[in-house]
Amino acid sequence: MDLLIRLGFLLMCALPTPGERSSRDPKTLLSLSPRQACVPRTKSHRPVCYNDTGDCTDADDSWKQLGEDFAHQCLQAAKKRPKTHKSRPNDRNLEGRLTCQRVRRLLPCDLDIHPSHRLLTLMNNCVCDGAVWNAFRLIERHGFFAVTLYLCCGITLLVVILALLCSITYESTGRGIRRCGS
């Protein structure tokens, strides 16, 4: 029991306090990994175009202008999106209703551009479905240490329950064999 209390205390220490900056703050988003920000990366060190054209974004352009242009494209796509796409319940703004598929399609080929504040907001509000994206969201929300602690506690609890079940089953079958033998 003492171990569980200590683990709970460590978990509470790992969670961010209300005064700390949220990982969803656009300034912090610059340091997020591409998977957490729903931004697809290059495959085999070559840029991948998702805009259905062979024209890749020129690296000489201003990164702010690129970010604003991309944000404008995303907003236009969000306005035209079918109502069947899922949104998170807390997404009330148009930017939050974007899907990853649309973001991937609209993403410029030059993936190393420094995104603007508005572009970061769009990427962060990108809606991704599936267990893998939910795991990344959980890590982003609670931190890697806390999620690792959750998993360790869960696995330990599962092992203890299985050990108890096995010992109970072994005792009951062992007594049954002795009774039959006597």
From Swiss-Prot:
Subcellular location: Host endoplasmic reticulum membrane
One Pfam family here: US6
Name of the protein described by the UniProt record: Unique short US6 glycoprotein
Superkingdom of origin: Viruses
Stored InterPro entries: US6 (IPR035129)
Entry domain remark: The ER-lumenal domain is responsible for TAP inhibition. It is sufficient to inhibit ATP binding to TAP.
Sorted UniProt keywords: Disulfide bond, Early protein, Glycoprotein, Host endoplasmic reticulum, Host membrane, Host-virus interaction, Immunoglobulin domain, Inhibition of host adaptive immune response by virus, Inhibition of host TAP by virus, Membrane, Signal, Transmembrane, Transmembrane helix, Viral immunoevasion
Entry's transmembrane regions: 144-164
Keyword Glycoprotein: yes
Quaternary organization: Interacts with UL18.
GO cellular component terms, A-Z: host cell endoplasmic reticulum membrane; membrane
GO biological-process terms attached to the record: symbiont-mediated suppression of host antigen processing and presentation
Residue ranges that the UniProt entry lists as topological domain Cytoplasmic: 165-182
Parts of the chain on the Lumenal side: 20-143
Keyword Lipid biosynthesis: no
Family, per entry: Belongs to the cytomegalovirus US6 family.
Glycosylation site residues: N51
Biological role stated in the UniProt entry: Inhibits peptide loading of MHC class I molecules by transporters associated with antigen processing (TAP). Does not prevent peptide binding to TAP, but binds to the lumenal side of the TAP complex and inhibits peptide translocation by specifically blocking ATP-binding to TAP1, but not TAP2. Also prevents the conformational rearrangement of TAP induced by peptide binding. In consequence, infected cells are masked for immune recognition by cytotoxic T-lymphocytes.
Disulfide bonds: C38-C126
